[in-house]
Amino acid sequence: MSVRLRMRQALPAAMRARDKAAVSALRAALAALDNAEAVPVDEAELRGLALEQSPVGVGVTEAARRELSERGVVDVVRAEAAVRLDVAAQLTAPAHADRATQLRAEAAVLLRFLDGPGTA
């Protein structure tokens, strides 16, 4: 089973369990995966169209998407975990201890998905 699918399946369970770290990490990682699949839009094609020339119909507003390989998914999730660990390491002031702990917990959630079956 793919990393993305396991993450999508884990999100509702984390929400039911009220696991804030898991919910936050999974939502952010899934959004990062969606963003990584986005294809740049050529705004020159859309700019300056009169209302009558605007695209109309089912699916015309859908954006093209790239297909990430499983390796690409793993790389994005690993990068999301690394960002959290880097930020947590920078939060050294006692006032930020709770936030650093939260970020480390989120990184641990993401790294668990990379250690499971079907990661590469």
Stretch-by-stretch model annotation:
Residues M1-A120:
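Charged, compositionally biased, marginally structured helical/coil segments
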